[in-house]
A protein has these predicted regions:
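Conserved, well-ordered active-site substructure
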Residues: 83-107, 154-208, 217-255
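Beta-strand-turn-beta hairpins that frame and shape the catalytic cleft
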Residues: 21, 31-34, 120-122, 170-177
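Short, solvent-exposed aromatic-acidic interface loops
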Residues: 40-48, 129-134, 181-185
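Active-site-adjacent helix-turn-beta-strand microarchitecture at beta-sheet edges
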Residues: 75-160
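Zymogen propeptides
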Residues: 1-107, 113
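A short, polar/proline- and glycine-enriched secondary-structure boundary/capping micro-motif
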Residues: 47-51, 134-139, 187-193
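Structural recognition of the beta-strand scaffold that forms the well-ordered cores
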Residues: 71-75, 114-116, 123-126, 167-169, ...
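Conserved beta-alpha junction segments in alpha/beta enzyme cores
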Residues: 12-14, 21-25, 143-173
Length: 255
């Protein structure tokens, strides 16, 4: 238990093809009093352009304060490594910071969809074409990639690659699940395909789940429940924390 309404589970298993896989899952009870789901940004700042990057640990340090304690975070959207442009829209606390998608044919798994928390505290995962008609009812938003579970149906088979993954999903009973899958490390964790991620999310009871930025960006942070420090739970494939452009974080109303 990371905090009331926030639980972490680590799963390490060997698949039928003998490849090892290590998964970290955060279960968030969205309807638990004092638990909030938010978009994290570098320096906890509402930025509309000239985007910057920070590690999750640095983002957590800036966002954390009494009665707004960061309990867990995962990395979120993709970005252009040369221009720092974020691929999808960004909303924070109802403020629209960016309301467009940057899709490139050379990067067909990015800028396809978005994740949102509505102003009445409901989760949404939807295709990018649906964003315009919904944007003014959305409180927290980031862009996302391939939808791996669509209304209970596993999807994403078009892209068979095995990689480190970051995934966010939700169930119809008010639970949100952060999941990261380590990869590219032989005998520890190879990673997963989109179809495998969708299967795991469905087994967890999710109805919708979507891929976020993966590879070396795949990272999960928690506030250690005993030591009261921020800790990266997985093993980033870069060998260290990679600074990222935004994150999904869960905060709790604790002193």
């Amino acid at each position: 238990v990371v905090a009331l309404g926030v639980t972490e589970t680590d799963v390490h298993f060997q698949k039928a093809d003998t490849r090892y896989t290590h998964i970290y899952i955060i279960d968030i009870e969205l309807n638990e009093p004092g638990v909030s789901l938010e978009v994290g940004m570098p320096y906890d700042a509402d930025v509309r352009n000239n985007f910057q990057r920070q590690t999750l640990t640095e983002m957590a340090d800036y966002a954390d304060r009494p009665w707004h304690r960061v309990a867990a975070m995962i990395n979120a959207d993709f970005w252009d490594v040369s221009t720092m442009d974020i691929r999808g829209p960004i909303h924070r606390n109802g403020v629209i910071l960016k309301n467009s998608f940057i899709f490139k044919e050379s990067l067909p798994q990015q800028a396809l969809s978005f994740i949102a928390l509505t102003k009445d505290n409901k989760m949404v995962i939807a295709d990018s074409v649906e964003y315009r008609g919904m944007q003014y009812n959305l409180k927290e938003v980031t862009g996302s990639g391939v939808i791996v579970l669509r209304d209970g149906e596993i999807s994403g088979a078009t892209y068979p690659g095995i990689d480190p993954r970051t995934c966010l999903g939700y169930s119809d009973d008010g639970h949100v699940y952060f999941m990261v899958v380590d990869g590219r490390v032989e005998f520890y964790s190879y990673g997963l395909t989109y179809t495998e991620m969708g299967s795991i999310r469905k087994a967890l009871g999710c109805s919708w789940a979507v891929n976020l930025d993966g590879g070396g960006s795949t990272q999960m942070l928690i506030r250690h429940p005993i030591a009261d420090i921020f800790q990266i739970r997985n093993r980033p494939s870069d060998g260290q924390e990679r600074p990222v452009v935004n994150a999904w974080m869960v905060t709790v109303n604790e002193p």
